[in-house]
Swiss-Prot record:
Superkingdom of origin organism: Bacteria
Full protein name: UDP-N-acetylmuramoylalanine--D-glutamate ligase
One BP annotation, GO: peptidoglycan biosynthetic process
UniProt organism field: Zymomonas mobilis subsp. mobilis (strain ATCC 31821 / ZM4 / CP4)
Keyword Nucleotide-binding appears in the UniProt entry: yes
Gene Ontology cellular-component annotations: cytoplasm
Compartments where located: Cytoplasm
Length: 441
């Protein structure tokens, strides 16, 4: 795990004990810090107590709610990014007591700063954006591995960052960073900061689009001038951020990638993946990786689950899981990638319209709506001349689409919505899709 003398002797209150919270508690205790930890789930608290009874007995770990406990001497509140600070009373308490609210990425940044001051040079690549950041992160990580460099992928993807073993000198950290995580980070000076795109998302958390855009922008405002900002300027908000950056600026566009090149990358199809690829290539060039290694890595990249993932084929019909597409801007390039699609969409809507998808309605053989957004989105599509069936559930939609689809057509789950009305997250939705497809006759 990642530990640091920076944390030694400090007193932290960790709020939220899911994977990253548990890893934070472990890293802080191993760094000789004192910890107050809390989660509203009593079973989670019980597991923590069983795991760290010795630390509790020695007074190094206190399981208590910081909202009601004695917090004298607390150095910082370390909050899970899933906790909405704008609606949680911890924000008022922190302001009243003058205690900073940070996240595990900020703890990593402080540890990383200590390493650099003591001669260990490990570049950090931070990737943010509305859509494509997971694929871009994973692709950069894959290219680095193919180049033989020590590298670690973390942040908003994979295992909790503080649970990982630190890299040796010269290793490269590749971090996917959500707007929530950036909000809780104050000293992360990325050697290379990457922006995929910005479209409306998480607006309730950030008080509107401008607040969301500024959260993304902070990653670049934290950079010092010797470092690099790699920004895809295919949208206006990203262009605005590019103008504000004090770092060495590298701008790219999705159309920098030719169709002739992209056809050779089996798991990087569609215009959105052209953007992901050109960003990853720019980062790799900055890090001194050869064109030959980059080219081979683009071909061998296996892709991520639930992102244009080919699930299987039945009677000449291809089934694709794009459950990660939780807004219309993410769904649009998936619809652009194939000419004959049976489109499964719906869930918890993030916007009232599907405007980014309109240009590709001519690719839709039929749409199948599910979940909360189903009736409204069905009406929108009918008004646009798209054939629609209101299915309600994912299982009904998949089975009907499988019956209707003809050879050489595609059944695609690319929902343009969040999943929380019917599933715990987009991963559970994608796994359910896969199980239903596998159970088809």
């Amino acid at each position: 795990m990642i530990t640091s003398p920076v944390f030694s002797g400090q007193f932290y209150a960790v709020l939220g004990l899911a994977r990253s919270g548990m890893a934070t508690v472990a890293a802080l205790l191993a760094s000789d810090a004192k910890v107050m930890a809390w989660d509203n789930n009593p079973e989670t608290r019980d597991r923590l107590q069983q795991q760290y009874q010795e630390a509790i007995d020695k007074g190094r770990l206190v399981i208590s709610d910081p909202m009601i406990a004695d917090i004298f001497g607390i150095s910082a509140f370390v909050v899970s990014p899933g906790i909405p600070i704008n609606r949680h009373p911890i924000a008022a308490l922190a302001k009243e007591r003058g205690i900073p609210i940070i996240g595990d990425i900020e703890l990593f940044a402080q540890a990383h700063g200590f390493w650099e001051r003591h001669g260990r040079r490990c570049p950090v690549v931070g990737i943010t954006g509305t859509n494509g950041k997971s694929t871009t992160t994973a692709l950069i990580h894959h290219i680095l591995k193919e180049a033989g460099l020590p590298t670690l992928m973390g942040g908003n993807i994979g295992l909790p960052l503080l649970a990982a073993d630190p890299l040796p000198d010269g290793g490269v950290y590749v971090l996917e960073l959500s707007s929530y995580q950036i909000d809780l980070t104050f000293t992360l000076d990325c050697d290379i900061a990457v922006l995929t795109n910005i479209t409306p998302d998480h607006l309730d958390r950030h008080g509107g689009f401008e607040g969301y855009r500024k959260a993304k922008e902070r990653l670049f405002l934290l950079q010092s001038s010797p470092h690099y900002a790699v920004i895809a300027t295919d949208d206006i908000p990203s262009q605005v951020i590019a103008k504000q950056s004090a770092a060495h600026l590298v701008t790219v566009h999705a159309d920098n990638i030719s169709a002739e090149d992209q056809v050779n990358w089996p798991n990087l199809q569609g215009p959105h993946n052209a953007q992901n690829a050109v960003l990853a290539m720019a980062v790799a060039h900055i890090l001194g990786i050869s064109d030959d290694v980059i080219s081979k890595a683009l071909i061998s990249y296996a892709g991520l689950p639930h992102r244009m993932q080919k699930i299987g084929e039945r009677r000449g019909v291809l089934f694709i899981d794009d459950s990660k597409a939780t807004n219309a801007m993410a769904t649009a390039p998936a619809l652009a990638a194939f000419p004959a699609i049976h489109w499964i969409l719906g869930g918890v809507p993030k916007t009232a319209d599907l405007d980014p998808c309109k240009a590709f309605y001519n690719h839709i053989r039929q749409a199948y709506t599910i979940g909360q957004a189903g009736p409204d989105y069905a009406q929108l599509l009918r008004e646009a001349g798209v054939n629609v069936v209101e299915c309600g559930t994912l299982e009904k939609a998949v089975r009907l689409a499988a019956e209707e689809a003809q050879p050489d057509e595609v059944v695609m789950l690319t929902p343009a919505c969040a999943s929380f009305d019917q599933f715990s997250d987009y991963e559970a939705r994608g796994q359910a899709f896969k199980k239903i497809v596998e159970a088809l006759d």
